[in-house]
C-alpha cells in the first residue's frame, strides 16, 4: 500500500494514498475535516482549562490516528488518549503514527466503538464520536459510559436525513421528523441534540451544550454531561416541535413530547409542516465560546482564521431565538429583489430587536422581530421609505 506524509497541527501523519474520501477506503482519512479537528482541539483545551485537572480522552473512530495524535500533542494536561478502530490496518497505521510523533500516552486498540466505551465505563473525561454517517448507534454507549462532568463531541454526516431530504432515515435513526426548510441545518442539529438528550435521560443524565455547528457536509455537537434525576427531567423540557408555514414562512415552537400542535397558520391560514421532536433550548454557550476564542489566539492551527470566523458568528447568534429568516426566501415570497442584508439588519437593530447573522446560511438573519413587521420593513427599504435622511 502506497502512503505519504501529511502535516496537520503539530503532528506528521502517514496516510494511505487514495483517489477520493470514502468509507470503503482501507483506512479512513479526510483532509476536509481538518477544521473539525482544529475546533475539537480548541474546545477540548478550553474544557480542560475549566475542569482544571488532567483528562483522559477516547477517540472511538481512530482511522489513521490523526485525531488521537493531535489531542496528545496539542491539548494541555492530557493524561491518556485511547484510540479505537475495528479495522486492523487502521490500528497498525495508528500505532506507527504514534511512533512517528514520539507519542507515549496514546493507547491504540482494535475494538468496536460500543465495546470500547462499555469496557471503560466512567474512565473517560472526553468521548469523541466521529463516524462516517450517523452516530445514532453509538450514542447510548456514550451516554451510559461517559464520566459525569465529561465532554461529549459527536459528529453526524448523514445530513440528508437530518435536514429532511429523506424523511424515513431520520425517523428510523433519530426518532424525529425532519423538515426541509431554509433553516433545515439548524433543525438537524436540534434533532441530533434532542436525540442525544433522550439517550442520556435513560441514564439519569442531561447535557449542557457548549458549542454546535453545521459545516461542509457534517454537523457537530459539544456538550457537558451532568447527572441528576430531577435536573434530567427539567432538561427534557427543552424538547418540542417546530410548526412551519411554507406559504408565508411563519413558524412557532411548542414544548413537550406530546403537545397539542396547531395545524393551521394563524397569519395566512396555510397548513403547517411540523418538525420534531427537537431541542428548543440553547445550542451555544456564549461565555464558553468567548473564552475559547481567547484561547485560540495562542494555538497553532492551520484553519485558525476560518475557525475564529465560525466562533464569532456563533457567539453573535447565541442569544437569538430558535430558527432564523432567509432574506432571499422572504423577498421571493414578496416578489421583489432582495435589498442589502446589512441595511435590513441596521433597521432591525434601530428598532430595538435582536439581530445577528447566522453561520448556518449566508443570507440568514436571526431576529425576534415579528415576521409581518420584518416583511413590511423590507418593503419600505425597497421603496426607499427608510434611511437616515427620511
From Swiss-Prot:
Q: What name does UniProt use for this protein? A: tRNA (guanine(26)-N(2))-dimethyltransferase
Question: Keywords in UniProt for this one?
Answer: Metal-binding, Methyltransferase, RNA-binding, S-adenosyl-L-methionine, Transferase, tRNA processing, tRNA-binding, Zinc
Gene that specifies this protein: trm1
Biological process (GO), any one? tRNA N2-guanine methylation
Give every Trm1 methyltransferase domain span: 4-378
Identify the EC number(s): 2.1.1.216
PROSITE patterns for this protein: SAM_MT_TRM1
Q: Which reaction does it catalyse?
A: guanosine(26) in tRNA + 2 S-adenosyl-L-methionine = N(2)-dimethylguanosine(26) in tRNA + 2 S-adenosyl-L-homocysteine + 2 H(+)
User: What InterPro entries does the database record attribute to this sequence?
Assistant: SAM-dependent_MTases_sf, Trm1, TRM1_arc_bac, tRNA_met_Trm1_C
Amino acid at each position: 500500500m502506497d502512503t505519504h506524509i501529511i502535516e496537520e497541527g503539530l503532528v506528521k501523519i502517514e496516510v494511505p494514498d487514495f483517489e477520493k474520501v470514502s468509507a470503503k477506503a482501507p483506512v479512513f482519512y479526510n483532509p476536509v475535516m481538518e477544521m473539525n479537528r482544529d475546533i475539537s482541539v480548541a474546545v477540548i483545551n478550553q474544557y480542560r482549562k475549566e475542569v482544571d485537572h488532567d483528562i483522559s480522552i477516547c477517540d472511538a473512530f481512530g482511522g489513521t490516528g490523526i485525531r488521537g495524535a493531535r489531542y496528545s500533542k496539542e491539548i494541555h494536561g492530557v493524561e491518556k488518549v485511547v484510540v479505537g478502530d475495528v479495522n486492523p490496518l487502521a490500528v497498525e497505521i495508528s500505532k506507527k503514527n504514534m511512533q512517528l510523533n514520539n507519542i507515549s500516552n496514546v493507547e491504540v486498540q482494535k475494538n468496536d466503538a460500543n465495546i470500547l466505551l462499555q469496557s471503560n465505563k466512567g474512565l473517560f473525561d472526553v468521548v469523541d464520536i466521529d463516524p462516517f454517517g450517523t452516530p445514532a448507534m453509538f450514542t447510548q454507549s456514550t451516554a451510559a459510559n461517559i464520566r459525569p462532568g465529561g465532554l461529549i463531541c459527536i459528529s453526524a454526516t448523514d445530513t440528508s436525513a437530518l435536514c429532511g431530504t429523506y424523511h424515513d432515515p431520520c425517523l428510523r435513526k433519530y426518532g424525529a421528523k425532519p423538515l426541509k426548510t431554509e433553516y433545515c441545518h439548524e433543525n438537524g442539529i436540534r434533532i441530533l441534540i434532542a436525540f442525544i438528550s433522550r439517550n442520556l435521560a435513560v441514564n439519569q443524565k442531561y447535557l449542557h451544550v457548549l458549542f454546535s455547528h453545521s459545516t461542509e457536509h457534517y454537523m457537530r455537537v459539544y456538550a457537558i454531561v451532568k447527572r441528576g434525576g430531577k435536573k434530567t427531567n427539567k432538561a427534557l423540557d427543552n424538547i418540542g416541535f417546530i410548526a412551519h408555514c411554507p406559504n408565508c414562512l411563519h413558524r412557532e415552537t411548542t414544548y413537550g413530547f406530546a403537545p397539542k400542535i396547531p395545524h393551521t397558520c394563524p397569519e395566512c391560514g396555510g397548513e403547517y409542516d411540523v418538525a420534531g421532536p427537537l431541542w428548543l433550548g440553547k445550542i451555544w454557550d456564549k461565555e464558553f465560546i468567548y473564552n475559547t476564542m481567547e484561547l485560540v489566539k495562542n494555538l497553532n492551527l492551520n484553519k485558525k482564521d476560518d475557525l475564529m470566523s465560525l466562533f464569532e458568528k456563533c457567539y453573535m447568534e447565541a442569544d437569538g431565538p430558535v430558527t432564523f429568516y432567509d432574506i432571499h426566501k422572504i423577498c421571493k415570497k414578496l416578489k421583489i429583489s432582495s435589498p442589502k442584508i446589512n441595511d435590513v439588519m441596521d433597521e432591525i437593530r434601530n428598532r430595538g430587536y435582536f439581530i445577528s447573522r447566522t453561520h448556518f446560511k449566508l443570507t440568514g438573519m436571526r431576529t425576534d422581530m415579528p415576521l409581518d413587521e420584518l416583511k413590511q420593513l423590507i418593503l419600505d427599504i425597497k421603496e426607499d421609505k427608510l434611511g437616515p435622511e427620511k
